Amino acid sequence: VKALLGCGSLDENTYIITDEASGVSAVIDPNFEFIKAEDAVKGLNVKYILLTHGHFDHVFGADFVHTTYGLLPRLSADEQATYAAAAEQMRMFLHRDFPLLLPTPGAPFAEGDVIAVGTLRLRVIATPGHTPGGVCFYEESEGVLLSGDSLFDGEIGRCDLPGGDEDTLVSVLQRKVLTLPEDVTVLP
């Protein structure tokens, strides 16, 4: 797992998951910095753009990956409206207009789906609450959970944005994330 850490005050992380055996990779939550990080994907066999949710800071670099690799970003069906509103979110947070090109999403995934990245298996865990259709990706054999904004470093994700619901997020995390093995590494 290669991390491209957060950008400025938004502090969003992008991850590149690569299966060592096959060289197949997935880009998860391509952020603002990602479009300046061409070297991070140079020579990789990128097969997926995976989004934990549709907030603008997690999708800003999706068009770069789409243009470079001809891939469509994938997110949950319940997250399509959040993704479609990314430019509006950016205006709300940054108080200015930026060009935000969003490729049409590819096939949505759902709770329990398994995405094969070479020999790695990312299981989709639906974790609504930060957004209506947010997810985490769990790779059991490596003991890694990619949490998006469902979990921050040391705390739960914020729930005060449109579509957020703290009770839902807490309940989901208790039922689905806290039941994972204790030695799981969480990558927010």
What residues fall within each predicted segment?
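Residue-level marker for the onset of beta-strands and adjacent loop->beta junctions
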Residues: 13, 24, 105, 111-113, ...
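Short, glycine/acidic-enriched loop or turn micro-motifs at the edges of active sites
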Residues: 22, 32, 56, 129, ...
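Active-site HxH/HxHxD metal-binding segment of metal-dependent hydrolases
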Residues: 32-116, 120
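Short Gly/Pro-enriched turn/cap motifs at secondary-structure boundaries
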Residues: 5-7, 104-106, 126-128
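Divalent metal-coordination and catalytic microenvironments
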Residues: 17, 29, 53, 65, ...
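Conserved beta-strand hairpin/beta-sheet module of binuclear metal-dependent hydrolase folds
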Residues: 1-44, 136-148
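Metallo-beta-lactamase
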Residues: 89-92, 121-188
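Residue-level marker for buried hydrophobic side chains located in beta-strands
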Residues: 26-28, 50, 73, 146, ...
